């Protein structure tokens, strides 16, 4: 590599002799290119981590790292863990997002060419002491690290290199480093990523890197030269406590790029400067105490620093440097134990602290080791007789107090410039803008997973990085580069007085500051809802710093937002949402002692959540979970970034990892709900298609196979804040499984003092069985009697019960086999004719989709009846257990904590509109379930198969099958009618059990029903349903058949087609909410139906005749009028399903028999048929009558 020849630099001082001991190891990087063949099952057999959006949590390295190699996979033997991925199929992987790297691997096809670099240590010969070099030498002495090992936090060389991202920052410039600046990241930023506190680095020294030098808190690194580094930036350098960049070496930058410095760096001037430096004696910590050092050997004369400039001639050239650092005794106080002991001297290199190797250890970690010493500090040091480290010219930490080594406050040792860089990666939070140079401060927390809750939130620098730097002059450069004394200490501040109301709430020692927000508020936040929000750092030069906010202040209120109990993520988001230029009023209290305790113990956020969606594992640090799991969140701003929460899974305290934050979780839950809805629509379509076929076998298969396993939708948010509380009432009991009906009856009969069945309101017109809706008031009355309410409801209704804080005990009977179900039911209920196969299949579907609703599971054994004893014990145990209740709703009970039911009834939901039968697709539509349910009427073997799908998508009308392939809106429409009736009879509920879109569907259905009279007036359709055998050949007819349409149309007792009645039936419900009897309901319905028929019968008959005439004249276009005219589409479908000729039948019965209808006996017979069809589920309009009861 060529050396820039026209600009020399003063020679660099040598390191101490121990660094040149023989047998040292040097780290080199070897580059490999491997070609992987994708396996059909294992893929490429590797796992990658890292990336710009997923940096290493210890040092912020953003390389793409091979985190795992699958044994026996395609990469086994070719790649190793912790290989750095340089290129994938010619695409550079430097400073890219993790998702981008994964995408490149996925789209590689079957072959992937991967270029990686791998670290390797080699033995190097001992370095010989070199004579002093003059200004023309172009040599840069290589510093090698002491080869120590550490058992703590992976500080050894091996653990640093083999950890994720590595504690060893190894950044050689490999081929991709020289790619053009059009890349997302240019060469001048190759070194700017690393701001770690004292990590071993293999860093390229590029000409554009001077302003990106290390900001670490305990190390200094010799960097390359930046030709853009002008006089205004010459103070932009390391401010660390333990290392600093050579000052003469820094001035060499200006000699190389500023002609004004030529004279200052002549040989004569350098010799004089060195003489002056030696004559001044040991440097002091500050100008006020120039000779406050403890006695130490005087530094010997040594050659001055030299400057070396390395320039690449090719993009793939490497600098070949490895930089290291070590903790040393920088200063000793006169009164400290170290000075009194006499065995320590300034400049001694500390090799171990209490047995822990300090190689590349940060000052923060060293301080914590010292704090844990408990009054006994054991050090292993190496004496540096030349005192190389303490005599390197550097800037002094004027803002750090001289104190005992055990009281080092490394968090306060930043110089002004370093603090500005330390917080500069807050640009992720405080602004959408990105700084051109973004130093990383991810080394603030050594144990991020255990202490992330107390990790401060960084913030963004608002101005130029070196904009406030005082230019250096030629005279006394060493001291004129020192920053001025901190201004906040100059004079006491007078804070604004908060209002009396705020003082009464927050206390008398509250201070108030008010300022106008700039680009950012300029605050780093620590803590969380468990301990409070604290100021962890203040950006210099911002209004917050000028107004007197200090580190350790607890923020109590910002503008109108109370920060007490606020999670750290919400606090950061609130500050970000304040518009630029708006006034910010902050109420704070100085609580430095509490703040120190928070940082020591790592506490921050702490709250519990319950998930209501499913999440797969995204990264190795992530947790996978399903619906209904509970977590304790300990940090809402993991790694100082928005997007992930650090959480602990309840029930497994050792399982800690990342979960999506609230906003991401809501997005994922909405996507899953949308997919679930789409799956339901497709299932409904295929169910309708199956219903149109007349084959019994296909219907059976359709019901079982096409009833897709769809998860129950929920009204809960993605994350529900929960608390663990005891239920102060007897919780309702819901049983699922093949013997649930038997178990409920057994509990109610044998233990009447403890259990009572909640009666359901009838939903079927003429039905003698209570299979409808359950009043919440009925449940409340049972609970007030200090009994468990036995509920026969759907899984969807269970979710609603949880939403309304009824906390039901949900027990699932898990069958062992289909034969076992049959054996048990025959033994427990010999008269039951339910299909064991259907019950077994239904139980399996429940177990797959609704397991998150179960609070307990009882495994059935057909050989005995021990399940009943287990059931009683389980209910008793569940009643005594604490319940995870919604935190928000629990807060609403503070006014009346004793009266549990006062809060439950305050929800306003006086009715639980849910079906008592479990439906095949687990939606709470009425009338569903068929033989699948546990408490439905037995199906005689000789009767036709009644599919639960039929009732799930009822009514099975041919016109409806054509017009609306999806029956779901009909079920929702009926539920909406029930809800409307509820709202008429009770106060508005706090929540609506059904989606609001049902209202619109209800209107649409009513409109469509009014247009379908002419189809339903077709007597041939009725004639086809008169014979009992018709139902065995195909699907049952949608309405009970009257013997004839021969009655006079003036009489009110007109046959009622089902879809006609839906619209009118609802009107009757609005007029009379409580008919006296089923017969009264029928009469009211017939009156409303008759009014509509009087107005439209003639018009419909004429249209029917015209349609038939057109069809006969133009048979080739027979289907055209049916498709274009909405009232007609049912006619061809209806006729196609009947053997008799359909087209000629409609007109004559209307014309011939309109004048005469049947007698009252026929009317009574019709009503009986109506009742029978309703019982059997054939009557498609039964839902309207059932909902009338509400």
UniProtKB/Swiss-Prot annotation:
Gene3D superfamilies: 2.30.42.10, P-loop containing nucleotide triphosphate hydrolases, SH3 Domains. One of its GO terms (biological process) is maintenance of blood-brain barrier. Residues 1188-1190 are annotated as: Interaction with SCRIB. It is found in: Cell junction, Adherens junction; Cell membrane; Cell junction, Tight junction; Nucleus. Keywords: Cell junction, Cell membrane, Disease variant, Intrahepatic cholestasis, Membrane, Nucleus, Phosphoprotein, Repeat, SH3 domain, Tight junction. The modification Phosphoserine is found at residues 16, 130, 150, 153, 163, 168, 170, 174, 200, 220, 232, 244, 266, 325, 398, 400, 406, 415, 424, 430-431, 499, 702, 902, 913, 920, 966, 978, 986, 1006, 1067-1068, 1147, 1159. Its main location: other. Residues 169-291, 415-446, 956-967, 994-1014, 1166-1175 have a biased composition (Basic and acidic residues). Residues 152-306, 408-506, 920-1079, 1105-1190 are annotated as: Disordered. GO terms for molecular function: cadherin binding; cell adhesion molecule binding; guanylate kinase activity; protein domain specific binding; protein tyrosine kinase binding; protein-macromolecule adaptor activity. It holds the Pfam family SH3_2. Residues 1060-1072 have a biased composition (Acidic residues). Residues 33-120, 307-385, 509-590 form the PDZ domain. The modification Phosphotyrosine is found at residues 574, 1118. One of its GO terms (cellular component) is adherens junction. Belongs to the MAGUK family. Homodimer. Interacts (via PDZ2 domain) with TJP1/ZO1 (via PDZ2 domain). Interacts with OCLN. Interacts with UBN1. Interacts with SAFB in the nucleus. Interacts with SCRIB. Interacts with USP53 (via the C-terminal region). Interacts with claudins, including CLDN1, CLDN2, CLDN3, CLDN5 and CLDN7. Interacts with CLDN18. Interacts (via N-terminus) with CTNNA1. This is Tight junction protein 2. It comes from Homo sapiens (Human).
């Amino acid at each position: 590599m060529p050396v820039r020849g026209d600009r020399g630099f003063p020679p660099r001082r040598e390191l101490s002799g121990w660094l040149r001991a023989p047998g040292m190891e040097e780290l080199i990087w070897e580059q490999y290119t491997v070609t992987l063949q994708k396996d059909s099952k294992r893929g490429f057999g590797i796992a990658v981590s890292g990336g710009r959006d997923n940096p290493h949590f210890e040092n912020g390295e953003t390389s793409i790292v091979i985190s795992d190699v699958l044994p026996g996979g395609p990469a086994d033997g070719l790649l190793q863990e912790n290989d750095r991925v340089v290129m994938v199929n010619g695409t550079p992987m430097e400073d890219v997002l993790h998702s981008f790297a994964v995408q490149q691997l996925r789209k590689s096809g079957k072959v992937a060419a991967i270029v990686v670099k791998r670290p390797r240590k080699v033995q190097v010969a001992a370095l010989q002491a070199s004579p002093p070099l003059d200004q023309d030498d172009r040599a840069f002495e290589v510093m090698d690290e002491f080869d120590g090992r550490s058992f703590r936090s992976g500080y050894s060389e091996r653990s640093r290199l083999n950890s994720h991202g590595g504690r060893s920052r190894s950044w050689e410039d490999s081929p991709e480093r020289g790619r053009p600046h059009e890349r997302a990241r240019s060469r001048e930023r190759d070194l700017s990523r690393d701001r770690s506190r004292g990590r071993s680095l293999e860093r390229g020294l590029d000409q554009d890197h001077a302003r990106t030098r290390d900001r670490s808190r305990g190390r200094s690194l010799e960097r390359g030269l930046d030709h853009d580094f002008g006089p205004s930036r010459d103070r932009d350098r390391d401010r660390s406590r333990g290392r600093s960049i050579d000052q003469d070496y820094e001035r060499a930058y200006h000699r190389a790029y500023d002609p004004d410095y030529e004279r200052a760096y002549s040989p004569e001037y350098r010799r004089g400067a060195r003489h002056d430096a030696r004559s001044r004696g040991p440097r002091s910590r500050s100008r006020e105490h120039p000779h406050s050092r403890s006695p130490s050997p005087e530094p010997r004369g040594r050659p001055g620093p030299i400057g070396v400039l390395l320039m690449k001639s090719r993009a793939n050239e490497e600098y070949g440097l490895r930089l290291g650092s070590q903790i040393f005794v920088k200063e000793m106080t006169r009164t400290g134990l170290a000075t009194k002991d006499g065995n320590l001297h300034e400049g001694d290199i500390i090799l171990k602290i209490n047995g822990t190797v300090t190689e590349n250890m940060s000052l923060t970690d060293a301080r914590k080791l010292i704090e844990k010493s408990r009054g006994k500090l054991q050090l292993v040091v190496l004496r540096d007789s030349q005192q190389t480290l303490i005599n390197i010219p550097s800037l002094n930490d004027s803002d750090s107090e001289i104190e005992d080594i055990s009281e080092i406050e490394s968090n306060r040792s930043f110089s002004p410039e370093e603090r500005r860089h330390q917080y500069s990666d807050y640009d992720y939070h405080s602004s959408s803008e990105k700084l051109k140079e973004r130093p990383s401060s991810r080394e603030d927390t050594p144990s991020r997973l255990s202490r992330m809750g107390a990790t401060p939130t960084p913030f963004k620098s608002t101005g130029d990085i070196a904009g406030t730097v005082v230019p250096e002059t030629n005279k006394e450069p060493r001291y004129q580069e020192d920053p001025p004394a901190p201004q906040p200490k100059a004079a006491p501040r007078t804070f604004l007085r908060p209002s009396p109301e705020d003082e009464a709430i927050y206390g008398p020692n509250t201070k108030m500051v008010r300022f106008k927000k700039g680009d950012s508020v300029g605050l780093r936040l620590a803590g969380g809802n468990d301990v409070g929000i604290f100021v962890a750092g203040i950006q210099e030069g911002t209004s917050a710093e000028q107004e007197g906010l200090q580190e350790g202040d607890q923020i109590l209120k910002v503008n109108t937002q109370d920060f007490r109990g606020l999670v750290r993520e919400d606090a950061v988001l609130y500050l970000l949402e304040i518009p630029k230029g708006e006034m910010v009023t902050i109420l704070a209290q100085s609580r430095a002692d509490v703040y120190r305790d928070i940082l020591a113990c790592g506490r921050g956020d702490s709250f519990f959540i319950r998930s209501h969606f499913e999440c797969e594992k995204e990264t190795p640090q992530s947790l996978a979970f399903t619906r209904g799991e509970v977590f304790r969140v300990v940090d809402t701003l993991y790694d100082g970034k928005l997007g992930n929460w650090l959480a602990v899974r309840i029930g497994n305290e050792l399982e800690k990892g990342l979960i999506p934050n609230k906003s991401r979780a809501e997005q994922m839950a909405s996507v899953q709900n949308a997919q679930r809805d789409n799956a339901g629509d497709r299932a409904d379509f295929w169910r309708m298609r199956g219903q149109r076929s007349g084959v019994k076998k296909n219907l059976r298969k359709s019901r079982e196979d096409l009833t897709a396993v769809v998860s129950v939708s929920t009204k809960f948010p993605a994350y529900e804040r929960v608390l663990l509380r005891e239920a102060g009432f007897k919780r309702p009991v819901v049983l699922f499984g093949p013997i649930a009906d038997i178990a409920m009856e057994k509990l109610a009969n044998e233990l009447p003092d403890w259990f009572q069945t909640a009666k359901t309101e009838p939903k079927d017109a003429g039905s003698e069985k209570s299979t409808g809706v359950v009043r919440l008031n009925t449940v409340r009355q049972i609970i007030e009697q200090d009994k468990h309410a036995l509920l026969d409801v759907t899984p969807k209704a269970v979710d609603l019960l949880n939403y309304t804080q009824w906390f039901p005990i949900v027990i699932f009977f898990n069958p062992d086999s289909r034969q076992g179900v049959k054996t048990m039911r025959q033994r427990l209920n010999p008269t039951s004719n339910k299909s064991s196969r259907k019950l077994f299949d239904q139980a399996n579907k429940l177990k797959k989709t609704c397991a998150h609703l179960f609070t307990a599971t009882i495994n059935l054994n057909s050989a005995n009846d021990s399940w009943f004893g287990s059931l009683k014990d389980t209910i008793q145990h569940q009643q005594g257990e604490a319940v995870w209740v919604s935190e928000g709703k629990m807060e609403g009970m503070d006014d009346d904590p004793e009266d549990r039911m006062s809060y439950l009834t305050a929800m306003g939901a006086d009715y639980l509109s849910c079906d008592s039968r479990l439906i095949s697709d687990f939606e709470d539509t009425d009338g569903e379930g068929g033989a699948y349910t546990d408490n439905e009427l037995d199906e005689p073997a000789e009767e036709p198969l009644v599919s639960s799908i039929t009732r799930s998508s009822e009514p099975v009308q041919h016109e409806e099958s054509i017009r609306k392939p999806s029956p779901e809106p009909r079920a929702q429409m009926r539920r909406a009618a029930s809800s409307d009736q509820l709202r008429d009879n009770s106060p508005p509920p706090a929540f609506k059990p059904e989606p609001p879109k049902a209202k619109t569907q209800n209107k649409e259905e009513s409109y469509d029903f009014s247009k379908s009279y002419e189809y339903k007036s077709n007597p041939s359709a009725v004639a086809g349903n008169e014979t009992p055998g018709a139902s065995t050949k195909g699907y049952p007819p949608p309405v009970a058949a009257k013997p004839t349409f021969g009655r006079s149309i003036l009489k009110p007792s007109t046959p009622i087609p089902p879809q006609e009645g839906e619209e009118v039936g609802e009107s009757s419900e609005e007029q009379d909410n409580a008919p006296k009897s089923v017969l009264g309901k029928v009469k009211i319905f017939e009156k409303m139906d008759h009014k509509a028929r009087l107005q439209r019968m003639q018009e419909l008959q004429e249209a029917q005749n015209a349609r038939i005439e057109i069809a006969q004249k133009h048979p080739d276009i027979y289907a055209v009028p049916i498709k274009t005219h909405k009232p007609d589409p049912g006619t061809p479908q209806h006729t196609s399903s009947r053997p008799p000729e359909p087209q000629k039948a409609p007109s004559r019965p209307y014309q011939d028999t309109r004048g005469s209808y049947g007698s009252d006996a026929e009317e009574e017979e019709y009503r009986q048929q109506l009742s029978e069809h309703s019982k059997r589920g054939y009557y498609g309009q039964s839902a309207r009558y059932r909902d009338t009861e509400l």
